[in-house]
Amino acid sequence: MKKLYFILAILFSQLAVGQNQAPVAVNDTLIIYHEDSIYKAAFEIMNNDFDPNGDTLAFDTISYNGTNQVSFIEITVSYSRFSRIIFKANPGFVGWDSIQYIIRDVATPTLYDTAMFYIFVAQKSSDFLDLNNIKALIDVDVLFYDNKNYVNGFEVPKGNGKGTIFAANPWVAGKHNNTVYSSARTFGGQVTPMDVTWRSGGPISNSYEGFDFHLKWDRVWKVTNIDLQYHISNWFYPNYQPPQVFLDWPAHGDTTNGQAFNLAPFVDKNNDGIYNPYDGDYPQFKGQQAIYFIRNDYQQQNTPNRMDIETHGMAYVYDCPSDSAINHTVFLDLTIYNRSNKTYDSTYVGLWGDFDLGNSDDDVMACDVDRSTFYVYNADSIDQNNGSVVGYGAYPPYQGVTFLKGAKQDDDGIDNAFGIAPYETINGIGFGDGITDNEHWGMEHFLPFASYGSTYTGFPINNQDYFHYLSGKWRDSTLFVFGGNGHISGGGTNPTKYLFPNGSDAYFYGTGGVVVPNVWSGSYNFGDAKGIGSTGPFTFAPQQSVELTMAFVFGIDYTTQGNLAGLPIMQERVDSIRSYFLNDFQSVCGGTLINSIKDETGVKQKQLTIYPNPFNNQFTVAYETENQSAYLAIYNLMGVKVAEQFINSSKTVVDVSNISDGIYFVVIQDGNNKLHHKILKQ
């Protein structure tokens, strides 16, 4: 009888196992940052696994055969062998990796299933410009914002842990058939598990689906003169290997996916129209260090009517420690393509910024109309620390954003004048220079706005809001007005293009020639104020592009305390940068600050000395001419020539008693040599 019971027990046990179903393991996918680590607990990985019978599941076996770093932490619970997987991507690794795991039924260990834990290591979506005294983070989605750690990415002076800009991004808006379209991002997207689709990297395409698309385009390309010079000097040798970034340079798009064929600019050594660094071709860039990015507006925030525009950006810096202006400036070139089939009229482009100058609780925003600049400064004399955020103390700086070249004005067949009448401006370029249809707007509008609260001065939430802010209106469609908080409810009456010009509009351009009080200073009643400067309007036709050049200029006075001390420093640096831009980047560093290394031998730079400087009516030019004579010209801050003469000896006295006091620039043309020097008459 006992033997019979034993046999029956075995039969019933086998029958139960036969009726029990095996667990189901489901593949997992996770996205991580470039060179990052992940820590995944067993229950997280098994979260989508299940047992049809409701039994408890446990890890049984985990195996990995890749090249990255993987480790397992064991658990003390008897039925589970592993509690956590640690994965760390090796330097330079991008793309797919995988870990195999087996789960088992705790009640019936012979029942199990196998699945894969896929890990997608994203491209390095950001990199730093760090050649001068600013360390600036450039991400494919956003400028100067560390969207991995949620902190400021614009450190200045470099290495001191203090920053002035939390984030910045271009905004575009226009009308088509009286419907408003816009493309605007603020802080960009984050690479979090399964959130890669919120990244905006890559050209306008038919399809943005798939990890391979994001692997190729969710990145930036950092190039340097060192790599460029190496390539130029060695590309023709057998077995030469170009720098990896040269091989990856996004010169061409995939036309089968609807992308434009020609994308990032390059020097075509053999003029065949095809980028190939093994033929000597190389990226074309500005500065001695540059970061290039391409983004689309397929994914964007709060803008359902997207414009189908493609933005190419090049941020760059120069290595010139002896020039304080160059040493404290980051440049940005934007080329924006209309890849749609729509013609947008009344189009504006702006630069939005969240400016956290040290401690952001006491920041003030204002603008300098004549210098085509908006800026942030401290509201009181001391910029205190705020928790982990380091303030600038008793020497708070100024951080400016300058429109060196705004949007091109629509062609009208005339040379529009420098002035305040319609189709004229006082802070653009090409106005009144005798050349037809070469005019570019300067900064046409500026406003700070609140992060929250007001229904008319708060953060934009739809296409109409973005268009209004870019074109000089509040969210309730009322024009900016001079005085108060810039809204008609604040007491102002006269329409204006600019809020808080702080006495900088010498021609009263912003108010259409109406004379208004000389000073209207910034206010920080907006809370954590953010600001937008814009340029336009212009017509944006299909397949056309618009080009802008911006400069982020930092100024600080290390000898004088107080919140006003840094203003003249920033203004002087802006003046220098604007002059350099108008004169092919001639700098005190010696000759031209090159936009890219030329494939030829450079000319040895001559030495130029001017004294006294500052001066009253006369100054002396000490310069050894290479030719029998050299041509000297003096320009004011607007690029207008105010004096000229020839240099025929090693020392030449120049009399400029007939010009007013101020900052000027001396340009000497000596054969192929062109030298530049800033002077101050007082």
Explain the meaning of each model-derived region.
Residues S83-I85, V546, S650-V654:
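Short strand-edge motifs at loop-to-beta-strand transitions and within beta-strands
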